[in-house]
Design a protein with these regions (language model features):
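Generic beta-sheet signal
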Residues: 34-36, 53, 102, 123-126, ...
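Conserved nucleotide-sugar donor-interacting segment of glycosyltransferase catalytic cores
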Residues: 82-151, 204-206
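Short, structured coil segments at secondary-structure junctions
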Residues: 46-47, 116-118, 193, 216-218
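N-terminal subdomain of nucleotide-sugar transferases
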Residues: 1-49
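Structural motif
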Residues: 2, 97-98, 196
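Phosphate/nucleotide-donor binding subsite
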Residues: 49-98, 147-156, 173
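A nucleotide-sugar donor-handling region in carbohydrate enzymes
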Residues: 34, 160-223
Length: 223
């Protein structure tokens, strides 16, 4: 059995997937990782195959690249990011039996898994990534977000967050899905996070606040 583990981020995003990969290897699985090129030499030294994706994170860690761009340049970068993901993850996933994606920039992996007819699992490292009436969505300053008041209506904020996901990524993702013969995505955030994500966080330090409103929250498995 072969598993593809994919993330786009810095060391804190990559290392948990590497730990998962080592455990899967110990169980006899073949593991392949899609990660930024910075980590290739280290991970290959652990006996796992690496397919580089995205830019080196060292070059983007000091300044948020989107914060310094015009809206048109932001759109071009977003389109390029999605196109690169569909190409890279699409090639890396060939011959794999499952895709595990971590961090919310997994914009192509769910479509690639659907196209190949294999399972896809999204993993969050912190409860705040996942919709819940008990906390606010992540604050993205480059998008113009500001921290909400302590007693804000979190459900309304999550509803707006879903609208923002659709506005930012919907048409870009749907264009690539159409090329694969897949239907458009109605809810981009749910498409990325899935309805049954894993929460890889210590249940004491980062517990999932159950019970919750099933109409607005996914069914979370805390690992």
């Amino acid at each position: 059995m072969r598993a593809l583990l994919s993330t786009i981020g810095s060391r804190g995003d990559v290392q948990p997937l590497v730990a998962l990969g080592e455990q899967l290897q110990a169980l006899g699985l073949e593991v392949r990782l899609c990660v930024p090129p910075d980590f290739r030499e280290w991970i290959e030294g652990l006996g796992m195959a690496v397919v580089p994706i995205g830019p080196e994170v060292r070059s983007t860690g000091k300044v948020d690249p989107l914060a310094t761009l015009t809206p048109q340049q932001q759109r071009q970068m977003m389109e390029g990011t999605v196109a690169s993901q569909f190409e890279t993850i699409g090639a890396a996933a060939r011959g794999c039996d499952i895709i595990v994606g971590a961090t919310a920039l997994q914009l192509a992996a769910p479509s690639v898994a659907q196209h190949l007819g294999i399972p896809y699992v999204f993993v969050a490292y912190c409860p705040i990534v996942l919709p819940s009436r008990h906390h606010a969505p992540p604050v993205l300053t480059w998008r113009g977000d500001a921290p909400p008041p302590a007693m804000a209506d979190y459900r309304a904020l999550w509803a707006k967050d879903a609208q923002d996901w659709n506005a930012m990524w919907g048409s870009i993702i749907d264009a690539h899905r159409a090329a694969l013969g897949l239907a458009p995505v109605g809810d981009v955030r749910s498409y990325v996070l899935t309805n049954q994500p894993w929460l890889a966080a210590d249940p004491t330090l980062g517990p999932w606040p159950e019970p919750d409103d099933a109409a607005t929250s996914p069914t979370v498995t805390q690992t």
